Design a protein with these regions (language model features):
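Alpha-helical residues within the helix-turn-helix
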Residues: 17, 28, 57
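Short, charged recognition helix plus adjacent turn
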Residues: 57, 65-80
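Helix-turn-helix DNA-binding elements, focusing on the entry/boundary residues of the two helices
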Residues: 12, 23, 34, 49-52
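Short alpha-helical DNA-recognition segment
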Residues: 20-39
Length: 80
């Protein structure tokens, strides 16, 4: 399944803001470049599973929880 890039970035941005983290702090915790995180959140780049895993751990979330949020965001655009 291919996710829409914006549907991937938005839940990451929301989770980051819920935790009160800046992009600089989250990217540091996740071990990725801030510019990479910015591109993911803006929907300009699609992260691989390893990056999603790193971001989830940095957000103190289970990777499955972050993936579920991404899936939920993706399904918002699918008509019933």
């Amino acid at each position: 399944m291919q996710f829409d890039n914006k549907a991937v970035g938005e839940p990451i941005r929301k989770a980051r803001k819920e935790k009160g983290l800046s992009q600089d702090v989250l990217s540091g915790f996740a071990g990725i470049a801030r510019t990479h995180l910015t591109m993911i959140e803006n929907g300009d780049k699609q992260p691989n599973f390893e990056t999603i895993w790193k971001i989830a751990v940095a957000l103190d979330m289970k990777p499955s929880e972050l993936v579920a949020r991404i899936e939920q965001e993706t399904n918002k655009d699918i008509p019933l």
